Amino acid sequence: MGSHQERPLIGLLFSETGVTADIERSQRYGALLAVEQLNREGGVGGRPIETLSQDPGGDPDRYRLCAEDFIRNRGVRFLVGCYMSHTRKAVMPVVERADALLCYPTPYEGFEYSPNIVYGGPAPNQNSAPLAAYLIRHYGERVVFIGSDYIYPRESNHVMRHLYRQHGGTVLEEIYIPLYPSDDDVQRAVERIYQARADVVFSTVVGTGTAELYRAIARRYGDGRRPPIASLTTSEAEVAKMESDVAEGQVVVAPYFSSIDTAASRAFVQACHGFFPENATITAWAEAAYWQTLLLGRAAQAAGSWRVEDVQRHLYDICIDAPQGPVRVERQNNHSRLSSRIAEIDARGVFQVRWQSPEPIRPDPYVVVHNLDDWSASMGGGALP
Protein backbone atom coordinates (compact mmCIF):
# COMPACT_ATOMS: atom_id res chain seq x y z
CA MET A 1 0.00 0.00 0.00
CA GLY A 2 2.78 2.38 -0.82
CA SER A 3 1.22 4.36 -3.68
CA HIS A 4 -0.68 7.64 -3.31
CA GLN A 5 -3.74 6.03 -4.89
CA GLU A 6 -3.85 3.36 -2.17
CA ARG A 7 -3.75 5.75 0.78
CA PRO A 8 -6.73 4.81 3.00
CA LEU A 9 -8.71 7.99 2.53
CA ILE A 10 -12.47 8.67 2.46
CA GLY A 11 -14.06 11.91 1.27
CA LEU A 12 -17.19 12.87 3.20
CA LEU A 13 -19.81 14.83 1.26
CA PHE A 14 -22.23 15.99 3.95
CA SER A 15 -23.53 19.52 4.38
CA GLU A 16 -22.99 21.43 7.62
CA THR A 17 -25.13 24.29 6.34
CA GLY A 18 -28.25 24.48 4.21
CA VAL A 19 -31.73 23.01 4.27
CA THR A 20 -30.70 19.42 5.16
CA ALA A 21 -27.77 20.25 7.48
CA ASP A 22 -29.33 18.57 10.55
CA ILE A 23 -29.76 15.18 8.89
CA GLU A 24 -26.48 15.32 6.97
CA ARG A 25 -24.61 16.19 10.16
CA SER A 26 -25.97 12.99 11.69
CA GLN A 27 -24.79 11.05 8.62
CA ARG A 28 -21.33 12.59 8.79
CA TYR A 29 -20.85 11.53 12.38
CA GLY A 30 -22.22 8.07 11.63
CA ALA A 31 -19.51 7.65 9.00
CA LEU A 32 -16.83 9.05 11.32
CA LEU A 33 -17.89 6.63 14.07
CA ALA A 34 -17.33 3.72 11.67
CA VAL A 35 -13.89 5.07 10.74
CA GLU A 36 -12.96 5.30 14.41
CA GLN A 37 -14.05 1.69 14.91
CA LEU A 38 -12.12 0.49 11.84
CA ASN A 39 -8.99 2.30 13.00
CA ARG A 40 -9.24 0.69 16.44
CA GLU A 41 -9.12 -2.60 14.53
CA GLY A 42 -5.91 -1.58 12.79
CA GLY A 43 -7.24 0.30 9.78
CA VAL A 44 -6.41 -1.17 6.39
CA GLY A 45 -3.09 -2.97 5.98
CA GLY A 46 -1.93 -1.49 9.27
CA ARG A 47 -2.56 2.08 8.11
CA PRO A 48 -5.30 4.23 9.67
CA ILE A 49 -8.16 5.38 7.48
CA GLU A 50 -8.19 9.16 7.10
CA THR A 51 -11.16 11.34 6.19
CA LEU A 52 -11.57 14.64 4.40
CA SER A 53 -14.72 16.75 4.73
CA GLN A 54 -16.17 19.66 2.83
CA ASP A 55 -19.44 21.55 3.28
CA PRO A 56 -21.41 21.62 0.00
CA GLY A 57 -24.19 23.61 1.70
CA GLY A 58 -26.98 21.57 0.08
CA ASP A 59 -26.07 22.92 -3.38
CA PRO A 60 -25.78 20.28 -6.17
CA ASP A 61 -23.10 22.26 -8.02
CA ARG A 62 -21.00 22.46 -4.88
CA TYR A 63 -21.34 18.72 -4.32
CA ARG A 64 -19.99 18.18 -7.82
CA LEU A 65 -17.11 20.61 -7.26
CA CYS A 66 -16.26 19.08 -3.89
CA ALA A 67 -16.24 15.58 -5.40
CA GLU A 68 -14.01 16.76 -8.25
CA ASP A 69 -11.61 18.37 -5.77
CA PHE A 70 -11.46 15.24 -3.62
CA ILE A 71 -10.71 13.01 -6.60
CA ARG A 72 -8.47 15.22 -8.75
CA ASN A 73 -6.51 17.07 -6.10
CA ARG A 74 -6.66 15.03 -2.89
CA GLY A 75 -6.22 11.43 -4.05
CA VAL A 76 -9.67 10.30 -2.86
CA ARG A 77 -11.19 7.21 -4.51
CA PHE A 78 -13.98 6.51 -2.04
CA LEU A 79 -16.74 8.96 -1.12
CA VAL A 80 -19.50 8.64 1.44
CA GLY A 81 -22.26 11.18 1.26
CA CYS A 82 -25.06 13.11 -0.44
CA TYR A 83 -28.61 13.32 0.87
CA MET A 84 -30.98 14.89 -1.65
CA SER A 85 -31.25 13.06 -4.97
CA HIS A 86 -30.17 15.98 -7.12
CA THR A 87 -26.90 16.11 -5.18
CA ARG A 88 -26.30 12.41 -5.86
CA LYS A 89 -27.05 12.93 -9.53
CA ALA A 90 -24.56 15.83 -9.61
CA VAL A 91 -21.82 13.60 -8.20
CA MET A 92 -22.62 10.51 -10.29
CA PRO A 93 -20.80 11.54 -13.52
CA VAL A 94 -17.77 12.62 -11.46
CA VAL A 95 -17.29 9.22 -9.82
CA GLU A 96 -18.10 7.39 -13.05
CA ARG A 97 -15.47 9.29 -15.05
CA ALA A 98 -12.84 8.70 -12.37
CA ASP A 99 -13.93 5.12 -11.63
CA ALA A 100 -14.28 6.11 -7.98
CA LEU A 101 -16.97 4.81 -5.62
CA LEU A 102 -19.74 6.72 -3.83
CA CYS A 103 -21.56 5.16 -0.87
CA TYR A 104 -24.99 6.83 -0.72
CA PRO A 105 -26.64 6.32 2.70
CA THR A 106 -30.06 7.78 1.98
CA PRO A 107 -33.52 6.62 0.85
CA TYR A 108 -34.19 7.46 -2.77
CA GLU A 109 -36.72 7.13 -5.56
CA GLY A 110 -35.29 4.05 -7.31
CA PHE A 111 -34.99 3.60 -11.08
CA GLU A 112 -31.23 4.09 -11.13
CA TYR A 113 -28.05 2.05 -11.36
CA SER A 114 -24.41 3.05 -11.44
CA PRO A 115 -21.46 0.68 -11.06
CA ASN A 116 -19.81 3.50 -9.11
CA ILE A 117 -22.56 4.05 -6.52
CA VAL A 118 -23.50 1.74 -3.65
CA TYR A 119 -27.08 2.50 -2.59
CA GLY A 120 -27.41 2.09 1.17
CA GLY A 121 -30.89 3.54 1.67
CA PRO A 122 -34.22 1.90 0.89
CA ALA A 123 -35.66 1.56 -2.60
CA PRO A 124 -39.46 1.95 -3.05
CA ASN A 125 -40.29 -1.69 -2.34
CA GLN A 126 -38.47 -1.43 0.99
CA ASN A 127 -40.33 1.62 2.28
CA SER A 128 -43.17 2.91 0.06
CA ALA A 129 -44.84 -0.48 -0.44
CA PRO A 130 -45.17 -1.45 3.24
CA LEU A 131 -46.08 2.11 4.20
CA ALA A 132 -48.91 2.31 1.64
CA ALA A 133 -50.38 -0.96 2.87
CA TYR A 134 -50.10 0.15 6.51
CA LEU A 135 -51.73 3.53 5.94
CA ILE A 136 -54.65 2.15 3.96
CA ARG A 137 -55.30 -0.59 6.48
CA HIS A 138 -55.00 1.54 9.61
CA TYR A 139 -56.07 5.03 8.56
CA GLY A 140 -58.09 4.99 5.34
CA GLU A 141 -57.95 5.26 1.58
CA ARG A 142 -58.01 9.05 1.08
CA VAL A 143 -54.55 10.62 0.98
CA VAL A 144 -52.95 13.98 0.22
CA PHE A 145 -49.35 14.11 -1.03
CA ILE A 146 -47.09 16.99 -0.09
CA GLY A 147 -43.40 17.19 -0.97
CA SER A 148 -40.41 19.42 -1.47
CA ASP A 149 -40.08 20.44 -5.10
CA TYR A 150 -37.24 18.30 -6.43
CA ILE A 151 -36.60 14.85 -7.90
CA TYR A 152 -37.07 12.52 -4.94
CA PRO A 153 -40.53 13.68 -3.78
CA ARG A 154 -41.96 13.75 -7.30
CA GLU A 155 -40.70 10.28 -8.18
CA SER A 156 -41.65 8.84 -4.78
CA ASN A 157 -45.15 10.24 -5.17
CA HIS A 158 -45.41 8.62 -8.60
CA VAL A 159 -44.72 5.22 -7.00
CA MET A 160 -47.01 5.89 -4.03
CA ARG A 161 -49.86 6.98 -6.30
CA HIS A 162 -49.57 3.66 -8.14
CA LEU A 163 -49.62 1.74 -4.85
CA TYR A 164 -52.67 3.60 -3.54
CA ARG A 165 -54.59 2.99 -6.75
CA GLN A 166 -53.88 -0.74 -6.49
CA HIS A 167 -55.64 -0.78 -3.13
CA GLY A 168 -58.58 1.30 -4.29
CA GLY A 169 -57.22 4.41 -2.60
CA THR A 170 -57.69 7.99 -3.78
CA VAL A 171 -55.03 10.70 -4.05
CA LEU A 172 -56.97 13.90 -3.36
CA GLU A 173 -54.17 16.44 -3.82
CA GLU A 174 -50.50 16.48 -4.84
CA ILE A 175 -48.79 19.59 -3.48
CA TYR A 176 -45.18 20.81 -3.74
CA ILE A 177 -43.43 23.54 -1.79
CA PRO A 178 -39.93 24.99 -2.31
CA LEU A 179 -36.93 23.48 -0.51
CA TYR A 180 -36.70 26.77 1.37
CA PRO A 181 -40.43 27.49 1.84
CA SER A 182 -41.75 30.85 2.99
CA ASP A 183 -44.43 31.05 5.66
CA ASP A 184 -46.93 31.81 2.90
CA ASP A 185 -45.85 28.71 0.93
CA VAL A 186 -46.48 26.53 3.96
CA GLN A 187 -49.78 28.18 4.89
CA ARG A 188 -51.19 27.82 1.36
CA ALA A 189 -50.22 24.16 1.28
CA VAL A 190 -51.72 23.48 4.70
CA GLU A 191 -55.00 25.12 3.72
CA ARG A 192 -55.23 22.82 0.68
CA ILE A 193 -54.55 19.84 2.94
CA TYR A 194 -57.24 20.96 5.38
CA GLN A 195 -59.84 21.50 2.66
CA ALA A 196 -59.15 18.06 1.13
CA ARG A 197 -60.41 16.24 4.27
CA ALA A 198 -57.95 13.39 3.80
CA ASP A 199 -57.55 10.36 6.06
CA VAL A 200 -53.76 10.72 5.97
CA VAL A 201 -51.07 13.07 4.67
CA PHE A 202 -48.06 11.54 2.90
CA SER A 203 -45.12 13.93 3.21
CA THR A 204 -41.84 13.93 1.31
CA VAL A 205 -40.92 17.37 2.58
CA VAL A 206 -37.28 17.35 3.70
CA GLY A 207 -35.00 19.46 5.84
CA THR A 208 -36.00 22.53 7.80
CA GLY A 209 -39.41 22.66 6.10
CA THR A 210 -40.44 19.42 7.84
CA ALA A 211 -40.92 20.87 11.33
CA GLU A 212 -42.51 24.01 9.84
CA LEU A 213 -45.06 21.92 7.94
CA TYR A 214 -45.93 19.63 10.86
CA ARG A 215 -46.31 22.63 13.16
CA ALA A 216 -48.55 24.49 10.69
CA ILE A 217 -50.81 21.46 10.22
CA ALA A 218 -51.19 21.11 14.00
CA ARG A 219 -52.15 24.79 14.27
CA ARG A 220 -54.68 24.60 11.44
CA TYR A 221 -56.50 21.61 12.90
CA GLY A 222 -56.36 22.96 16.45
CA ASP A 223 -58.20 20.66 18.84
CA GLY A 224 -59.98 18.87 16.00
CA ARG A 225 -59.01 15.47 14.71
CA ARG A 226 -56.05 15.89 12.39
CA PRO A 227 -54.87 13.24 9.94
CA PRO A 228 -51.53 11.60 10.70
CA ILE A 229 -48.56 12.68 8.60
CA ALA A 230 -46.66 9.71 7.17
CA SER A 231 -43.14 10.01 5.82
CA LEU A 232 -40.22 8.15 4.26
CA THR A 233 -37.70 10.70 5.50
CA THR A 234 -38.76 12.31 8.79
CA SER A 235 -36.28 11.24 11.45
CA GLU A 236 -35.23 11.92 15.01
CA ALA A 237 -33.35 14.98 13.70
CA GLU A 238 -36.54 16.64 12.45
CA VAL A 239 -38.62 15.50 15.43
CA ALA A 240 -36.08 17.13 17.77
CA LYS A 241 -37.16 20.46 16.25
CA MET A 242 -40.86 19.86 17.01
CA GLU A 243 -43.01 20.22 20.10
CA SER A 244 -44.11 16.85 21.50
CA ASP A 245 -47.79 17.40 20.68
CA VAL A 246 -46.86 18.23 17.07
CA ALA A 247 -44.81 15.04 16.60
CA GLU A 248 -47.14 12.68 18.47
CA GLY A 249 -49.04 10.23 16.26
CA GLN A 250 -47.03 10.79 13.10
CA VAL A 251 -45.90 7.74 11.10
CA VAL A 252 -42.47 6.96 9.63
CA VAL A 253 -41.01 4.03 7.69
CA ALA A 254 -37.26 3.36 7.84
CA PRO A 255 -34.82 0.47 8.23
CA TYR A 256 -33.76 1.67 11.68
CA PHE A 257 -34.91 3.73 14.66
CA SER A 258 -32.71 4.52 17.64
CA SER A 259 -35.47 3.20 19.93
CA ILE A 260 -35.02 -0.41 18.71
CA ASP A 261 -34.25 -2.59 21.72
CA THR A 262 -31.66 -5.04 20.40
CA ALA A 263 -28.08 -5.61 21.52
CA ALA A 264 -26.68 -4.21 18.25
CA SER A 265 -28.88 -1.12 18.41
CA ARG A 266 -28.14 -0.46 22.09
CA ALA A 267 -24.40 -0.73 21.42
CA PHE A 268 -24.70 1.68 18.47
CA VAL A 269 -26.71 4.21 20.48
CA GLN A 270 -24.22 4.04 23.34
CA ALA A 271 -21.31 4.54 20.93
CA CYS A 272 -23.09 7.49 19.29
CA HIS A 273 -23.75 9.14 22.65
CA GLY A 274 -20.04 8.95 23.40
CA PHE A 275 -18.98 10.21 19.96
CA PHE A 276 -21.58 12.56 18.45
CA PRO A 277 -21.56 16.26 19.38
CA GLU A 278 -24.69 17.71 20.98
CA ASN A 279 -25.98 19.06 17.65
CA ALA A 280 -25.91 15.65 15.92
CA THR A 281 -28.87 13.28 16.32
CA ILE A 282 -28.96 9.49 15.98
CA THR A 283 -31.07 8.72 12.90
CA ALA A 284 -31.71 5.94 10.40
CA TRP A 285 -29.50 7.77 7.93
CA ALA A 286 -26.66 8.09 10.46
CA GLU A 287 -26.98 4.32 10.85
CA ALA A 288 -26.84 3.89 7.06
CA ALA A 289 -23.70 6.03 6.81
CA TYR A 290 -22.21 4.03 9.68
CA TRP A 291 -22.77 0.58 8.21
CA GLN A 292 -21.83 1.61 4.67
CA THR A 293 -18.52 3.04 5.87
CA LEU A 294 -17.97 -0.06 7.99
CA LEU A 295 -18.67 -2.26 4.95
CA LEU A 296 -16.21 -0.24 2.87
CA GLY A 297 -13.51 -0.73 5.48
CA ARG A 298 -14.26 -4.43 5.93
CA ALA A 299 -14.03 -4.99 2.16
CA ALA A 300 -10.69 -3.15 2.06
CA GLN A 301 -9.42 -5.21 4.99
CA ALA A 302 -10.45 -8.41 3.22
CA ALA A 303 -8.77 -7.24 0.01
CA GLY A 304 -5.65 -6.00 1.78
CA SER A 305 -5.89 -3.07 -0.61
CA TRP A 306 -7.44 0.37 -0.99
CA ARG A 307 -7.85 0.08 -4.75
CA VAL A 308 -11.43 0.46 -5.95
CA GLU A 309 -11.42 -2.69 -8.08
CA ASP A 310 -10.04 -4.79 -5.20
CA VAL A 311 -12.50 -3.40 -2.66
CA GLN A 312 -15.47 -3.91 -4.99
CA ARG A 313 -14.56 -7.57 -5.50
CA HIS A 314 -15.05 -8.18 -1.78
CA LEU A 315 -17.92 -5.76 -1.17
CA TYR A 316 -20.68 -8.15 -2.17
CA ASP A 317 -19.45 -11.10 -0.11
CA ILE A 318 -19.63 -9.36 3.26
CA CYS A 319 -22.68 -9.27 5.52
CA ILE A 320 -22.58 -6.53 8.14
CA ASP A 321 -24.36 -7.03 11.47
CA ALA A 322 -25.67 -3.47 11.43
CA PRO A 323 -27.73 -1.83 14.19
CA GLN A 324 -30.85 -2.44 12.06
CA GLY A 325 -29.93 -6.12 11.57
CA PRO A 326 -27.96 -7.95 8.86
CA VAL A 327 -27.30 -5.96 5.67
CA ARG A 328 -25.54 -6.78 2.44
CA VAL A 329 -25.18 -5.28 -1.04
CA GLU A 330 -26.61 -7.08 -4.09
CA ARG A 331 -24.02 -7.63 -6.81
CA GLN A 332 -26.49 -7.28 -9.69
CA ASN A 333 -27.76 -3.79 -8.86
CA ASN A 334 -25.53 -2.27 -6.12
CA HIS A 335 -28.57 -1.82 -3.87
CA SER A 336 -28.84 -3.21 -0.35
CA ARG A 337 -30.91 -5.80 1.45
CA LEU A 338 -32.46 -3.86 4.31
CA SER A 339 -34.92 -4.28 7.13
CA SER A 340 -38.16 -2.30 6.98
CA ARG A 341 -39.90 -0.89 10.04
CA ILE A 342 -42.95 1.32 10.51
CA ALA A 343 -43.10 3.42 13.66
CA GLU A 344 -45.52 5.86 15.24
CA ILE A 345 -44.15 8.70 17.34
CA ASP A 346 -45.33 8.79 20.95
CA ALA A 347 -45.88 11.74 23.31
CA ARG A 348 -42.19 11.71 24.31
CA GLY A 349 -41.02 11.91 20.70
CA VAL A 350 -39.93 8.26 20.72
CA PHE A 351 -40.44 6.13 17.59
CA GLN A 352 -42.52 3.12 18.63
CA VAL A 353 -42.20 0.31 16.08
CA ARG A 354 -45.61 -1.05 15.03
CA TRP A 355 -44.47 -3.38 12.25
CA GLN A 356 -41.22 -4.78 10.90
CA SER A 357 -40.29 -7.11 8.08
CA PRO A 358 -39.48 -10.62 9.32
CA GLU A 359 -36.12 -10.47 7.54
CA PRO A 360 -34.22 -8.04 5.29
CA ILE A 361 -36.00 -7.24 2.04
CA ARG A 362 -34.25 -7.65 -1.30
CA PRO A 363 -34.17 -4.37 -3.23
CA ASP A 364 -36.39 -3.90 -6.29
CA PRO A 365 -35.08 -0.51 -7.50
CA TYR A 366 -36.78 -0.72 -10.89
CA VAL A 367 -40.13 -1.76 -9.39
CA VAL A 368 -40.05 -4.92 -11.46
CA VAL A 369 -42.76 -6.29 -9.15
CA HIS A 370 -45.75 -3.98 -9.59
CA ASN A 371 -48.31 -5.64 -7.34
CA LEU A 372 -48.38 -5.18 -3.57
CA ASP A 373 -49.38 -8.79 -3.02
CA ASP A 374 -46.39 -9.97 -5.06
CA TRP A 375 -44.15 -7.62 -3.10
CA SER A 376 -45.50 -9.20 0.08
CA ALA A 377 -44.25 -12.58 -1.13
CA SER A 378 -40.78 -11.10 -1.66
CA MET A 379 -40.59 -9.73 1.89
CA GLY A 380 -39.13 -12.79 3.51
CA GLY A 381 -42.48 -14.52 3.58
CA GLY A 382 -44.01 -11.79 5.68
CA ALA A 383 -47.38 -10.27 4.91
CA LEU A 384 -47.60 -6.56 4.28
CA PRO A 385 -48.71 -4.68 7.42
Curated annotation (Swiss-Prot):
It comes from the Bacteria. The keyword Heme does not apply. Changing residue 106 to N: In strain: PAC181; butyramide inducible phenotype. GO terms for biological process: amino acid transport; regulation of amide catabolic process. Signal peptide: none annotated. Keywords: Kinase, Repressor, Transferase. GO terms for molecular function: amide binding; kinase activity. InterPro entries: AmiC_PBP1, Leu_Ile_Val-bd, Peripla_BP_I. CDD domains: PBP1_AmiC. It holds the Pfam family Peripla_BP_5. Consists of two beta-alpha-beta domains with a central cleft in which the amide binds. Homodimer. Forms a complex with AmiR. This is Aliphatic amidase expression-regulating protein. The gene is amiC.
